[in-house]
Amino acid sequence: MESAEIRRRWLSFFEERGHTVVPSASLIADDPTLLLVPAGMVPFKPYFLGEVKPPFDRATSVQKCVRTPDIEEVGKTTRHGTFFQMCGNFSFGDYFKEGAITYAWELLTSAQDKGGYGLDPERLWITVYQDDDEAERIWHDVVGVPSERIQRLGKKDNYWSMGVPGPCGPCSEINYDRGPEFGVEGGPAVNDERYVEIWNLVFMQYERGEGIGKEEFEILGELPSKNIDTGLGLERLAMILQGVQNMYEIDTSMAVINKATELTGVAYGDAQASDVSLRVVTDHMRTSVMLIGDGVTPGNEGRGYVLRRIMRRAIRNMRLLGATGPVVKDLIDVVIGMMGQQYPELVTDRERIEKVALAEENAFLKTLKAGTNILDTAVSDTKASGGTVLAGDKAFLLHDTWGFPIDLTLEMAAEQGLSVDEDGFRRLMKEQRERAKADAQAKKTGHAGAGAYREIADKAGATDFVGYTDTESESTIVGILVDGASSPAATEGDEVEIVLDRTPFYAEGGGQIGDTGRIRVDTGAVIEVRDCQKPVPGVYVHKGVVQVGEVTVGAKAQASIDDRRRKAIARAHSATHLTHQALRDALGPTAAQAGSENQPGRFRFDFGSPSAVPTAVMTDVEQKINEVLARDLDVRADVMGIDEAKKQGAIAEFGEKYGERVRVVTIGDFSKELCGGTHVHNTAQLGLVKLLGESSIGSGVRRIEALVGVDAYSFLAREHTVVAQLQELIKGRPEELPEKVSAMLGKLKDAEKEIEKFRAEKVLQAAGGLADSAKDVRGVALVTGQVPDGTTADDLRKLVLDVRGRIQGGRAAVVALFTTVNGKPLTVIATNEAARERGLKAGDLVRTAAKTLGGGGGGKPDVAQGGGQNAAAIGDAVDAVERLVADTAK
């Protein structure tokens, strides 16, 4: 049974039993604690935690998953992989143990012609938690599994929790006996190589308390709502149903291995070392395609680093196999060919996926040879000196200059019997980051070093900031910098940095951007100020352009800020304080500020949270903020000692350093924070605050984007206009729109199903005529042809199998049909048993056809699929298939 059919049967089985089919979520987890989705239940986590009420009682999905903790083992064993698909069924307060167990048994053991997987019940073994009498009773008394095939295991194996206080419960695993050739008997408690786990049923019925690890924690009691979370590894079940030894030999993986062997000339099974490389390439290319398809791009941090690491590992292993040129495009084509039916977005997004992958391949190939030479020299030098540890600076050089991920260096060094000084590498990386941070600040402020500013400060003293009370000031120019160097003067058109003895300009800090405005010199010169920074303590630097005249040190000037812009920024900054306090009231003190940025009419606020904030909580926070605005609370700023400020409960701003005297901004009885920024005088001046939403920006950190004042009103006005337009189109009140739109979408879905049914029937109507057109080639009934453009891969496969079934009389039959999808050729070829007995295998025929089409393909001996780039070559591909049939048929 093909992987696509396993997936289809899973979803169909549970949909027929009242489950809502939920499409696979993106691999980019909507959870700050996770880099990538590692399990099928992750998209449902908010429902299990009670953060969001689920819109259904039952759900089922086939979720894309990526796990990378054992990436170094991928290829070395046949059990490790980074990408897999997790089939799951979920119940939220609906059915519980008996429902989950009976559903699982029915699907696994029902005959294949009845929609099941047709597994032999005698080969299924069950494990339950050691104290779960109820689960064992259901398995034995209700399902009928003999007691000798039910084993009890402890918390380590058969109890599930998230590792923190929250839902937990016992689980029951279904294991398949692969036979005596895989080891001794005795069940999964004795041999997990022979008895392979295929399905895990988790019974979430208890609340976990504090504790350590997977075993040492307290059970606080039963949950008010008992839930079901199950997971079945699709690739593992495919391994069993397809009768192969491991997951690398199933249809979706073997096609990639076949392409890699075609590109390198190294056959799978020739040698242990080459088999390892072929498995690495197969797994990592599948993972790469799925990650890029979900929007991940190669980089040096987070998900981007995971992708870069596995891509470069795959490329290097192709080189070890003998590839000399670019290979990823060919491999991507095969992956999409095998996975595109289940995930059609891969086909739609093929061009972007290939573009991202090719860019990474080209970048790595440019440096791989040189980097490998550097590493080989370093390894030789280390061994020659009797050392066993590669120096950290060598690993840093490979990373910094040649783009080698540290993991690749570790792996390549280990192949030569060396370890790597990782501490030294990390120290050098830290020093580089600190230099980069300093360089970025220098670029931002436009200075080449702090010396010039300190020199000005030594001569003229610190800048007197009067911007809390004044928008203008009479000032003296005490310093001018042009191109980062001190200058006595600057002329019209020069980009300059001006230092004044006194200024109303706020310098960027505390999340508030710098002021803009003008400096008018008594001589008539005018400087447009575009930013204000404070590169060294006490010195305010006004960055801008001399618009008119000449500016000299010592000249008198009038400095004035853009007051309208300043007020808009002040509204945003005060709104940030209100948002911070409202979040702390809603979520507790853990919702501490982790950064902010205040701009005219809008702000963003970063805060700590282990998970997404529920929509209902966000609505309450927004309402509370606007209620404070309506209370007309005064905003006051006081300077006091740091100890007094702490005594009053003032909250410190993220990332700021404070002296003995601090400025405390108080908003009525609602908020009190240490802050050096500018603010409104009364909350009514904010007018309106609209929170646009929150999202994850890193592990444990969320970000809120918001609008203030006129910007918030304009946003709501636009939304109101859209709602009014929808009312006109749908003929309903605003509160009726969700229900009406949902009903319309339901009708649309039904119509699409009817169209799909009609289209499939039209395609199959052609089957009879095609079967009648069979051509005799050395006693083989050969059917070839091109069907209408745009026929889907699924429909083409159905048509091919239908035509094959119409050729009767025990004749050997080969059916090879072609079409084009989005201008690119696609072929499906099938053979019957009589043809296979004469040496005709669909996979061989497809590879021949696909090669003629400028692409690749693969599959099983009875049916295979391929594609290419050159649709004009379909006629040549038909001829190539006919020649191969004539040459091969015994």
Curated annotation (Swiss-Prot):
Keywords: Aminoacyl-tRNA synthetase, ATP-binding, Cytoplasm, Ligase, Metal-binding, Nucleotide-binding, Protein biosynthesis, RNA-binding, tRNA-binding, Zinc. GO terms for biological process: alanyl-tRNA aminoacylation. Binds 1 zinc ion per subunit. It is found in: Cytoplasm. It holds the Pfam family DHHA1. The keyword Nucleus does not apply. Its EC number is 6.1.1.7. The keyword Transcription does not apply. InterPro entries: aa-tRNA-synth_II/BPL/LPL, Ala-tRNA-lgiase_IIc, Ala-tRNA-ligase_IIc_anticod-bd, Ala-tRNA-synth_IIc_core, Ala-tRNA-synth_IIc_N, Ala-tRNA_ligase, Ala_tRNA_ligase_euk/bac, DHHA1_dom. It catalyses: tRNA(Ala) + L-alanine + ATP = L-alanyl-tRNA(Ala) + AMP + diphosphate. PROSITE patterns: AA_TRNA_LIGASE_II_ALA. GO terms for molecular function: alanine-tRNA ligase activity; aminoacyl-tRNA deacylase activity; ATP binding; tRNA binding; zinc ion binding. It is an enzyme of class 6 (ligase). It comes from the Bacteria. Its cofactor is Zn(2+). SMART domains: tRNA_SAD. Zn(2+) binds at H573, H577, C675, H679. Its main location: cytoplasm. One of its GO terms (cellular component) is cytosol. NCBIfam families: alaS. Catalyzes the attachment of alanine to tRNA(Ala) in a two-step reaction: alanine is first activated by ATP to form Ala-AMP and then transferred to the acceptor end of tRNA(Ala). Also edits incorrectly charged Ser-tRNA(Ala) and Gly-tRNA(Ala) via its editing domain. Consists of three domains; the N-terminal catalytic domain, the editing domain and the C-terminal C-Ala domain. The editing domain removes incorrectly charged amino acids, while the C-Ala domain, along with tRNA(Ala), serves as a bridge to cooperatively bring together the editing and aminoacylation centers thus stimulating deacylation of misacylated tRNAs. Belongs to the class-II aminoacyl-tRNA synthetase family. This is Alanine--tRNA ligase. It comes from Streptomyces coelicolor (strain ATCC BAA-471 / A3(2) / M145). The gene is alaS.
